[in-house]
Amino acid sequence: MSLDISQFPVLAQANTPNELRQLPQALLPQLADELREFLLKSVGMSSGHFASGLGTVELTVALHYVYNTPFDRLIWDVGHQAYPHKILTGRRDRMHTIRQKNGLHPFPWREESEYDTFSVGHSGTSISAALAMAVAAEKEQAGRKVVAVIGDGAMTGGMVFEAMNHAGDLHNDMLMVLNDNEMSISENVGALNNHLAQLMSGRLYTTIRESSKKVLKGMPVIKEMAKRTEEHLKGMVVPGTLFEELGFNYIGPIDGHDVDALVETLRNMRSLKGPQVLHIMTKKGRGYEPAEKDPIGWHAVPKFDPSQFKKPATKPGLPTFSQVFGKWLCDIAEQDEKVLGITPAMREGSGMVEFSQRFPKQYFDAAIAEQHAVTLGAGFACEGFKPVVAIYSTFLQRGYDQLIHDVALQRLPVLFAIDRGGIVGADGPTHQGAFDLSFMRCIPNMVIMAPSDENECRQMLYTGYCYDAGPSAVRYPRGSATGATQVEAMTALPIGKGVIKRLGKRIAMLNFGTTLAAALTAAESLDATVVDMRFVKPLDVDLVKEMAQTHDVLVTVEENAIMGGAGSGVLELLQKLKMPKPVLQIGLPDEFIKHGSPEEVTHDLQLDAEGMLAQINAFLAD
């Protein structure tokens, strides 16, 4: 159910950027207030990313007011902050469907709107894409402008600086808006700095600046002196030296919640030549007190009543696999001070809050820099430490070369705790953990484990901790554990050995991971054997051979891409053993998995017990 737009009289007049640009500038502050209120209520109805969008309301209004979108290109890095953008670009009446099956995409998505010029979800991609679009715009000579909006968190990734280094060299016209919500230099925000930014972006200043460069071109000594003088004067009030060194003209920081100042500064900057940086200061969660006080806790929210000023109480229930990992990490750190926990900026999501507080000297947040996080683990392993890299499946993709070159090639004992393996759900195709078993299985020296429940998860983590012949990975899903009885004593499992969970006839289901419960349910109707394979690599050769010899049909089950996954490993083994056998592979299809609740996606892909049974019966009927 959508909100009554009559309660938002100015927002009602701005369903598209064209309509927004028809409004008098005097109405923009009221529009921003109404947009923030609409965002607050709509996310309360639907769930979704919350605090980031509250902080970019004024910026979104100003950008669409000054720039001729979608002709001018606007790219949002990551996309958590883009809900106001969606509201102002014709999707207002569908905001209550965001992140839901067949609803609006959780991030900017090219297939959804012409205003979404680049599909996003992972951080640090915006500057590279914007640079390419800026080069294309220059070739077209149509007067197109290009803007990228990136947060200070994403600025910790190396790809951003690679792109900025290239942009500074090419010197195409583009604007990078740095949305800084960490308040690290808040003393520079205010009327004086807003005024300074408008002066520095104004035509008189830039004309004098560029003319002076031409005059001084033939006098390098004086030119260098003038440059240093300018940098010194600017450096007294602005922290832009790094950007200037990379070839960008730096403006700011200015108040990112002053829509009039943003409009005037953006108008000035729109005509500037070369790469530009506008540094704005914002507050994550702006306008909603609980989110302002706890922006991390309010980063993403379930459905809630904004009038209650609190999120709904979490119902007591089973721990999540992330919490199971976090507790294990604390338990093992109590015993071994050489255990080091590494995360690429996912402390909360990976269950490492308690570990970071209890063992601060053993905790390393590498920021949004997955390549660095993986090689950091490799370096620690070289020095005899026990590094544990906690990382989401989708983000391990970003450190793949380091996994091969820096870890596996050297047989370094780095343990990878891979969270969000398999179906993630509402965050959609950019975040589904669909590929990790496939891209890790082909790497020599890797040991890969897939626990079927939380107790097995603990034992496998301990197995990886004890394994010193090379890297190991334990891959587990998002969400609640299964309720298995936890065995406190930790025992290293025999490498490459599975266990039979149910003896049946004719059909043997070889299960990898937490799909075991559904496989057991399906097996009841089929009277099938069920094996908890435990290890994706190395496979239990003897057990696979036994199942092939004693059953007519094998079924592999995994929550990973079928192509190259665990089932492919079973087929490769059977071929090597010269044991031809009908094999049905159940897993994720060769497509990017759309957003929806995990239950909906699992059902649609026939990965629940009902779907498995249907797939097996259809296979047997052929």
Swiss-Prot record:
Q: Name one GO cellular component term.
A: cytosol
UniProt family annotation: Belongs to the transketolase family. DXPS subfamily.
Q: Which protein is depicted?
A: 1-deoxy-D-xylulose-5-phosphate synthase
GO process terms (BP) = 1-deoxy-D-xylulose 5-phosphate biosynthetic process; isopentenyl diphosphate biosynthetic process, methylerythritol 4-phosphate pathway; terpenoid biosynthetic process; thiamine biosynthetic process
Q: Where does thiamine diphosphate bind?
A: 80, 121-123, 153-154, 181, 288, 370
Q: Which organism is it from?
A: Shewanella sp. (strain MR-4)
Q: What does this protein do?
A: Catalyzes the acyloin condensation reaction between C atoms 2 and 3 of pyruvate and glyceraldehyde 3-phosphate to yield 1-deoxy-D-xylulose-5-phosphate (DXP).
Is Ribonucleoprotein a UniProt keyword of this protein? no
Query: What HAMAP family does the entry give?
Result: DXP_synth
Cofactor(s) recorded in Swiss-Prot or TrEMBL? Mg(2+); thiamine diphosphate
Keywords tagged on the record: Isoprene biosynthesis, Magnesium, Metal-binding, Thiamine biosynthesis, Thiamine pyrophosphate, Transferase
Q: Quaternary arrangement and interactors, per the entry? A: Homodimer.
Enzyme class comes to: transferase
Cofactor comment in the record? Binds 1 Mg(2+) ion per subunit. Binds 1 thiamine pyrophosphate per subunit.
- Enumerate the SUPFAM superfamilies for this protein: Thiamin diphosphate-binding fold (THDP-binding), TK C-terminal domain-like
- Give the binding site residues for Mg(2+): 152, 181
